[in-house]
Amino acid sequence: MRPSPVPHERPHGRTTAAASAALLVTAGLLAAPGAARAEAAGAAAIVVAPAGTKNADDNGPGSRGRPLATLGEAQRRARAAAAQGKHDVTVELLDGTYRLTSPLRFDAADSGRNGHTVTWKAARGATPVLSGATPVTGWEVDDAATGVYKAHVGAGFDTRQLYVDGKPAQRARISVARSDITLTPTGFTIRNPDLAYLATLPDQKRIDFQAMLSFTNRFAPVESISGSTVVMQQPAWDNNTYGYDAIQAPFRTPKFFLLNSRKFLDEPGEWYLDSTAGTLYYKPLPGQDISQVRAELPRLESLVQVGGTYDEPARNLRFEGLTFTGTTWLHPGTSDGYANQQTGAFISGVQPHRPPDAFTSCSSGCKGFEATRNNWAQAAAAVQVSAAEDIAFVDSTFVNLGSVGLGIGNDANAHATGVGLGAHKVSVVGSTFTASAGGGIVVGGIRPDAHHPSDPRMVNSDILLRDNRVYATALEYLDQDAIFASYVTRLAIEHNYVSDMPYTGIGIGYGWGANDPGGSPEYINRGLYDFQPLYDTPTTLSDVRVVGNHVRKVVQTMFDAGCIYTLSAIPRSTIDENYCESSGQLGLYFDEGSRYLSASHNVFAGTAAQWAHANNQNGNHTGDLTLIGNFSTNPAITGLVNGQRGNVVRDNVTISAGNIPAEAARIVYEAGPTGKYRGEPDPQRPPLGVSLTADPAGVSAGGSATVTATVANVSDGRAAGLAVSVTVPEGWQAERIGKPVKHGLAAGASATETWKITAPGSFTTPVSRAAVKASVTFSAGKTGYTVDRSLTLTALNPLTSLKAHGSVPSRFAEAGSEYAILTEGTDIWQDAAGSFDEYGVVYRDDAAGSTSTVTARVTQMDNTNAWAKAGVVLRNDVTGTGSSPGYAVMVVTPGNGVAFQWDSDGNGYLDSFSGVSGIRAPAWVRLVRSGDQVSGYYSTNGTAWTKVGPTATLPGIADRQDAGLIATSHAAGVTGQFGFADFGVS
């Protein structure tokens, strides 16, 4: 999909006049008319150079030959020029590092007037760096035995970050096992005698306790350590042991650390600052030459603050080609700590509704905790935009920052101007966010004025994030997303690259549905509405487009997250044509209250868990979701059923990573940054889609299938030198049908090549699978590509010794004493949820008399479901689906052990059950009949047998019954293979 020129241009349908006007205004952010008009008008740029540059002079003309010496003077002159309102104003920054002693603040006085733009940009060929850090020099050995060096950096300041050779270094820390300590309402008691030395440490109030939990990553500073008692600072400890995923009751096994003591400095790459003495300690990494190290010690918490007031916002400002770097964020080291809740939000201050026994009574939520939600704070960004309009960041880099890279329209607490929200028509294009403590971009606030503003000018609207790269960031505040937007009206997140993140890739929405009209039943039960209104109007969150993004390797550290994550109602919003690969958990995650979203034509490859999941528990209103035409390598989807809760779920396709359809290949190729921002060719995302199909997909021994390779050019350029080859395993034959493609493919064109694939005449196993591989070589531009695809052909030896029946599509095979059933089926079971008798069976007709034993070994099971079943069966007539009585099975499952099931009322359905957990294939199973009674047994070795459950009486049992092998995949429409051996009836 090509990027739309504006956040919400739609290819089909009519647009209202008001909407058209809004789109045209937003489009101006991308058109960048300022530079062109300035040239035409002959307006001279204001040129500035870093401090100490030769010929730089604040009293000079501010030209390339005699640039200004300070950014302050450049800003003063830009303000004066902008105030005239006659032309665009450009400030050019020459190459070098501009070390700030205080943040740059841009307000209404810095704004472009009369439709003109004020641009702060890199001079041609320059890479200017705005830094809040100072370089560290003068290293000397501190401890030769441990390889620790030190440098004097000046006393009287603190920092939580050090950047070495362009990467954040790790503060000195030790790991603390959960068994080393006992958590208490005031801190913890040391249980491990090896930690007794903690009581002797100096500067104890500067020591941090970190708890890495499920979806929260928490920090609290120490107050004191005496003997084995550690007392933590307040309210940090109270707030971190309050609510959900709390330190004392995490949702998964926690990891604890103590940080920031000289004594902890024992690993290469760690550092410690003695702020009183002004001494920095560092232990170099292997191979790191301390004399060549580039170390930057940050002193500022923010670099650029763009914002005016709602009456006089900052306007018409553009920042282009700049690098923002070298900040810290000190708040987590205060007595507040970082009582993290989710995605950069944290509890701040003393909580008046916290009960005295909250350490136990509120460790997994309580009514008092609900009172905190409306006052949660947000992490402050290094670059901040609020109360501002027509602001653009283009081709810029945000790196080595102590918190979030760029905050747009966050709450007032996260803006140094003291005015939050109110960000309109802000665009971030072609920029890079990496190697920082916090997430990349955060749009919107989380407090009441963010979702139900008391002043309409507070609404965040018309935000565009496009062609950016956000990767390997949130290195300290692991709970933060690469891109996160809470409450915003008209937001486009298009064609960004997101990768290597600890938590979610792209997160949209906040509030868990509690602030939507009518509220949330779950939060009614929790008591939230005793502390806030139950709103009857929608929030400001609507009209969001998440389109064409490439998201990979996310959810690498934390949990309860996905490639794309949503919360609450987001009317008129779409998630389309994104490519998600290698998520550590989910693909699409529709969390509490997610509504009114559609997700179409996305590709999910290698998600560790479901490709899509909706949290619709506890009465929340999650629903009204549309999922159409998506592709996934993991078939699992939960909480989303077509026709339930207003959901539409159809035409989604499970694909093989080695054989993706051409349409999926196009989506993969087009995902991520576009045009000049696309970057180097990616061999994993080639401009040619190649897919293999087989007709039929399964053959008999000696049979043939037609395999077709379809090659489609999904790019806008020509593919040349196309060549296709196919290989098959030994014993199989491949014969080309027709002539090969000898020409290239124009943009959008496709071609096919076909082969006849023939299986060997017989096999030594019931089922043989052959990997048919196609290799396609071609060139596009100056780059050569090879695309490999494969599919599996299944060939079955004929079933000759037994009969077969399938109540659902099934195939059967045998070789020697081994058998295979390939079948699907919802289940073989009847209860209140429904009556199911869907299976495949091979059997001997009327083989079991009144005294009979049926035995077999289940050798193999596809894990189509934990309750898939394979084993032995007795039934009057195994072809009498849903009607024949005398029905009993003894089966093995992939995830629930073995089960003896029987028809207790003679209606033709299994309805009674006994089981033993922990048993998997291979395992032996047996049914023993004596008159009208049947018993089930299992064995792990074929000699020692264990009875399962009671002996069952089967009403309507016949004198002679069919006996055989039965299987069901317990997954409607999903075929599994089930193997058997040593079948016998006696």
Regions found by a protein language model. Give the residues of each.
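Secretory targeting and sorting signals
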Residues: 1-40
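Extracellular polysaccharide-degrading/modifying enzymes targeting complex plant/algal/animal polysaccharides
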Residues: 47-387, 392-399, 407, 414-422, ...
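Short glycine/proline/serine/threonine-rich loop/turn segments at secondary-structure transition edges
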Residues: 86, 761-772
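Short glycine/acidic-rich loop motifs that flank beta-strands on beta-rich extracellular proteins
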Residues: 102-103, 301, 328-334, 380, ...
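Right-handed parallel beta-helix
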Residues: 315-326, 365-370, 389-400, 420-438, ...
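Short beta-strand elements of extracellular/lumenal beta-sandwich folds
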Residues: 702-717
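Intrinsically disordered, low-complexity Pro/Gly/Ser/Thr-rich segments with frequent PxxP/GP/PP motifs
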Residues: 735-762
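Extracellular glycan-recognition regions
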Residues: 792-986
